From Swiss-Prot:
Belongs to the GHMP kinase family. IspE subfamily. InterPro entries: GHMP_kinase_C_dom (IPR013750), GHMP_kinase_C_sf (IPR036554), GHMP_kinase_N_dom (IPR006204), IspE (IPR004424), Ribosomal_Su5_D2-typ_SF (IPR020568), Ribsml_uS5_D2-typ_fold_subgr (IPR014721). ATP binds at residues 91-101. It catalyses: 4-CDP-2-C-methyl-D-erythritol + ATP = 4-CDP-2-C-methyl-D-erythritol 2-phosphate + ADP + H(+). GO terms for biological process: isopentenyl diphosphate biosynthetic process, methylerythritol 4-phosphate pathway; terpenoid biosynthetic process. This is 4-diphosphocytidyl-2-C-methyl-D-erythritol kinase. It comes from Clostridium botulinum (strain Alaska E43 / Type E3). The lineage of its organism: Bacteria, Bacillati, Bacillota, Clostridia, Eubacteriales. Its EC number is 2.7.1.148. The active site is at 8, 133. The keyword ATP-binding applies.
């Protein structure tokens, strides 16, 4: 049994507080894009085995998809073993939820495969034990995510918007970025409610001009190349560009496929991980 595990971008990311346990309270708009891993799950006699086409991806308990299989087996007392194969296309440590979306895919497949058939809401609660992005990845589409990311409210779909996605040649630790984030230094917060109403109006110009990610305050300061990529995408004719999640990936929206194609070709001369895709 296999499914596509889609990457996500943030249309906005606001930090509104901090819990006693150190987790930040967020208000963010998440959006799936047509860039995906293919996650295959099969029954085997015992244990958990994981294989991936990218050698740098861990295939043991460090892998979130492996952890997802283990959690599901333990929660629902599954005796059968599990074989997971991941065809990885989403860059890792990129701010695109590559690990979370694979974990979500494993939970969704196992729920069907073993006829457990828990509700999406229950599956999302289980996914939260693996990471804050996993509940959204189970739900998908266009959504407002609050709390630490676990409170997911579906929004009107914001589909078929063209974007170019560029990841610089390094990864970023989400944990480290949040650790360095200082809420007291924030002056302007994202206009989340206005962004939501303009998603409903399908207003790509407003979205592109007003999308905001507070984690840029940390990551852009550490890596000048991210600002450079944003500028390069804008020069190519993007309606606007922004870093996704904790970074370092940058995306830009385009209203014209020809401009996007030219931008893709230009970026591909300098960077390895470049994609031309759409919102879904």
């Amino acid at each position: 049994m296999d499914i596509k595990a889609y990457a996500k971008i943030n249309i906005s990311l606001d930090v509104i507080g901090k819990r006693d346990d150190g987790y930040h309270l967020l208000k963010m708009i998440m959006q799936n894009i047509d860039l995906y891993d293919i996650v295959q799950v099969e029954k085997i006699p015992n244990g958990i085995k994981l294989k991936c086409n990218k050698p740098y991806v861990p295939t043991d308990e460090r892998n979130l998809a492996y952890k997802a299989a283990k959690l599901f087996k333990e929660t629902y007392n599954i005796k059968s073993g599990i074989y997971i194969n991941i065809e990885k296309n989403i860059p890792v440590s990129a701010g695109l939820a590559g690990g979370s979306t694979d974990a979500a895919a494993v939970l969704k497949i196992m729920n069907k495969m073993f006829n457990i058939n828990v509700t999406q809401s229950e599956l999302m609660n289980l996914g939260l034990k693996l990471g804050a992005d996993v509940p959204y990845c189970i739900c998908g589409g266009t959504a407002l995510c609050e709390g630490i990311g676990e409170k997911v409210t579906k929004l009107k779909p914001f589909r078929d918007k063209i974007l170019v996605v560029v990841k610089p040649p390094f990864g970023v630790s989400t944990k480290e970025v949040y650790k360095a984030f200082d809420l007291s230094k924030v002056i302007f917060h994202p206009k989340t409610n206005e962004l939501i109403s303009n998603i409903e109006k399908n207003n790509i110009e407003f979205i592109s001009n007003n999308m905001k990610n507070l984690l840029e305050n940390v990551t852009l300061g550490r890596y000048k190349i991210i600002s450079t990529i944003k500028e390069e995408i804008n020069i190519c004719g993007a309606l606007g560009s922004m870093m996704s999640g904790s970074g370092p990936t940058v995306f830009g929206f385009f209203d014209d496929m020809l401009k996007a194609q030219k931008c893709y070709e230009k970026m591909k001369e300098k960077y390895v991980d470049v994609f031309i895709t759409r919102t879904i």
